[in-house]
Amino acid sequence: MSKKHCSELLPNKMFRNQDSKYLIPVQKEAPPVTTLPMKASTVKSPHNCEAILRDADPPISLSSVNLSEQLRSGVFLKPKKQIKYWVDERNSNCFMLFAKNLSITWSDDVNYWTWFTEKESPNENVEAVGLKNVCWLDITGKFDTRNLTPGIVYEVVFKVKLEDPAYGWDTPVNLKLVLPNGKEKPQEKKVSLRELPRYKWVDVRVGEFVPEKSAAGEITFSMYEHAAGVWKKGLSLKGVAIRPKQ
């Protein structure tokens, strides 16, 4: 039997380094990793978004790469930026109806109300209205629930502010919410504004409801007080928010 060189007797997983007397294990080449194709993630479009954005002011492209960001920060709608639309973290539709979109008794008379500019965002202003002196307070608005996300609990909220000198608020105001098709009794309550913090916008909640596709229609909401005949001053109104309950 012929003698074999010792290197020939080494296991096939070892070799001798020419520069070293030590044996170095040979690493097997790792098999290629098979990468499974990933499914493209899809984000569900907000309810009725395409129809809503037809009234965007300025216009917005549905194919914009920044559409999601724009919807989160808010989009103004026609006419004349009287409505703001945005989408919350749950992908639910939210709306703000500014004072110009509401029916306010005597708001066009400078003896009773005064209009002023309020900053809504770094680049956008909206019109708010301040009460100078009235005894007949009547603010009403309406909204089509077809643009609200079905199955979500929504609340209707007046955005108001009191500034001194303010008077006439010892008498509570009436709040009323009427749902579509008269299926439910109107939600009504009285709220005192006297103790509201001054010089800051606060929420005055009217009521809540769950919009349904089968019962879509128009809601109406109002804040009023004209039975007591008391003169009122110091109230400012920014608008009404219709948003998922917080």
Swiss-Prot record:
GO molecular function, one term: carbohydrate binding
A Pfam match: PP2
Classification via InterPro entries: PP2-like (IPR025886), PP2-like/Lectin (IPR052147)
Coiled-coil spans in chain: none
GO BP annotation list: response to insect
Tissue: Vascular tissues, specifically in phloem companion cell-sieve element complexes.
PANTHER family: LECTIN-LIKE
Protein name: Protein PHLOEM PROTEIN 2-LIKE A1
Protein's organism: Arabidopsis thaliana
